[in-house]
């Protein structure tokens, strides 16, 4: 039986992530739960971005907008004494769907630089709106008064929150894979390659891309909701352009057009970031070149690098068998 690195490594990573709470409890280091909880949450957001960026070719420089919206839904509702998780989830999905539909209808009529700038403009508009909400902390942010509660299950428990986020991540990877392999995904990928030809074949590509954009926004909103419960705090910085840039880096670093890629990318990026922070306060000077080198070494990302290693391993195996 031949070893498939592109399957084995992601599965091993998921298995490792599933065991993090057990290890954190065993060594009495809750910090690991917080660190990897952040990795899982950002992996969800990166997976959502990969749907439109990796498969649809839509470079959104404002995707963190939906991360911030999901977080602010939790923060504002809990501020008013509402801790019902089902209400938090429903409002998050509704708000992100409406904002995603509105911004998508306007931005998807353009391509290239124009699309990038429009998505960035919308994100910055909501960023400054959040800064102006003095009742909810303004630029200083807002502490989350109460964690989301689903019946008797409260996300105030770090282990419960971690496993909920991990389950959402696994669901997103599985559902995303099914979605892009279906007719819907074929149209999205075809539109990325040649939108005019797809329209000539009778496919309403704008409608398909809008649906993908809205789905992506809603999933990212769920990540924001989980992030607010993780940090017990919401801030306009969650939807800043720098946060959107980080999501793009995670997707590109992990590998475009592969739902396991963003999981690898978010894990690698946040672990490297955390490691460098412990070495020097000027960690960004080292971090930037490291990311650039990583992308240059493997233009298809870490997931693509696994494929390259698989090919080399197969060639070496055949060479050894030929000599034998």
Predicted regions and their residues:
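Transmembrane alpha-helices and adjacent helix-loop boundaries
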Residues: 1-324
């Amino acid at each position: 039986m031949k070893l498939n690195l592109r399957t084995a490594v992601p599965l091993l990573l998921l298995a490792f992530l599933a065991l993090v709470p057990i290890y954190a409890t065993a060594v009495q280091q809750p910090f690991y739960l917080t660190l990897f909880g952040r990795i899982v949450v950002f992996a969800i957001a990166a997976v959502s971005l990969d749907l439109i960026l990796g498969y649809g070719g839509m470079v959104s420089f404002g995707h963190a907008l939906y991360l911030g919206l999901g977080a602010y839904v939790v923060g504002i509702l809990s501020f008013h004494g509402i801790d019902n998780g089902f209400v938090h989830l429903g409002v998050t999905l509704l708000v992100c769907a409406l904002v995603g539909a509105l911004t998508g209808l306007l931005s998807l009529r353009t391509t290239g630089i124009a699309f990038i700038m429009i998505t960035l403009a919308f994100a910055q508009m909501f960023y400054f709106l959040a800064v102006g909400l003095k009742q909810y902390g303004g630029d200083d942010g807002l502490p989350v008064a109460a964690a989301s509660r689903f019946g008797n299950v409260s996300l105030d428990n770090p282990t419960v929150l971690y496993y909920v986020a991990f389950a959402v991540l696994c669901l997103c990877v599985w559902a995303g894979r099914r979605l892009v392999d279906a007719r819907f995904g074929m149209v999205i990928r075809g539109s990325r390659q040649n939108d005019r030809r797809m329209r000539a074949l009778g496919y309403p590509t704008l409608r398909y891309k809008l649906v993908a954009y809205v789905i992506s926004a809603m999933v990212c909103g769920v990540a924001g909701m989980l992030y607010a419960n993780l940090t017990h705090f919401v801030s306009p910085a969650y939807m800043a352009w720098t946060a959107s840039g980080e999501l793009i880096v995670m997707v590109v670093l992990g590998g475009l057009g592969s739902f396991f890629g963003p999981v690898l990318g978010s894990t690698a990026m946040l672990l490297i970031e955390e490691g460098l922070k412990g070495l020097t306060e000027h960690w960004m000077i080292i971090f930037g070149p490291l990311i650039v080198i990583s992308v240059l070494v493997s233009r298809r990302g870490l997931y693509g690098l696994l494929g390259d290693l698989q090919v080399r391993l197969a060639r070496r195996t055949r060479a050894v068998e030929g000599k034998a």
